[in-house]
Amino acid sequence: MREKLFWILKKYGVSDHIAKAFLEIPREEFLTKSYPLSYVYEDIVLVSYDDGEEYSTSSQPSLMALFMEWVGLDKGMRVLEIGGGTGYNAAVMSRVVGEKGLVVSVEYSRKICEIAKRNVERLGIENVIFVCGDGYYGVPEFSPYDVIFVTVGVDEVPETWFTQLKEGGRVIVPINLKLSRRQPAFLFKKKDPYLVGNYKLETRFITAGGNLGNLLERNRKLLREFPFNREILLVRSHIFVELVDLLTRRLTEIDGTFYYAGPNGVVEFLDDRMRIYGDAPEIENLLTQWESCGYRSFEYLMLHVGYNAFSHISCSI
């Protein structure tokens, strides 16, 4: 049955060394409920754990294989996985990176994390380490990583990950957009002090627990009162708000209205305008760049997400 999955992955253009890793790992060993083997090796999402309180899925294999392909996963690499679930994807990646590589997988649910630990131990997989906790903090003791591989929807790529990623390292990540409630995946490469990357495709993952899923609430605490500065008319304001969300990591919301909570100012986003209180040079610079790019949506832009630097966009991908 695993051979069937191998050929499905090959149809997606997946490299042999990645597709073959799926041949080596029995997916059924990571499922807590019984499925017919013919179903297990379909290219579909499967529920891997559900006790009525906590829930985990085994992601669609072709999507995981494409993620591995896009980050260039290969022998000897060190990978930080966020959202380990019951361990199947980490186990597959362990075969791709080989004995000299390492997969460090973080799972927020302690109950599910312990299941994942038992699963890889039972199969004798020695180059996977499971850490039970909030993936927001990464796992600094095993850094730097060549790849950060995210299999849950997150609100941001936190600075902790940026710090733990090698220069030139890659991040593949589904990001929860607060306005449209979409969950597009992005591929980024570290070029200090930026993550530079672009949109890849639409996804739908379980939303991360902990700090990776509560950015609106955390940013709400940053809101302060500043004197009114000025009002600027906005074309296609919903697109600009999503760029602010992706690039600044400072978006929040109160009663259906979105705000940028900056260090020296606040921006209120309305249907066709934005109101600036205090100073918000990051937003004004971003607006100028966006206008010069023809008001394009993020799918058609290159994103430069700054860490201790203003984020910006470029018009060509």
From Swiss-Prot:
The keyword Transferase applies. It is found in: Cytoplasm. PROSITE patterns: PCMT (PS01279). GO terms for cellular component: cytoplasm. Belongs to the methyltransferase superfamily. L-isoaspartyl/D-aspartyl protein methyltransferase family. Monomer. Catalyzes the methyl esterification of L-isoaspartyl residues in peptides and proteins that result from spontaneous decomposition of normal L-aspartyl and L-asparaginyl residues. It plays a role in the repair and/or degradation of damaged proteins. This is Protein-L-isoaspartate O-methyltransferase. The gene is pcm.
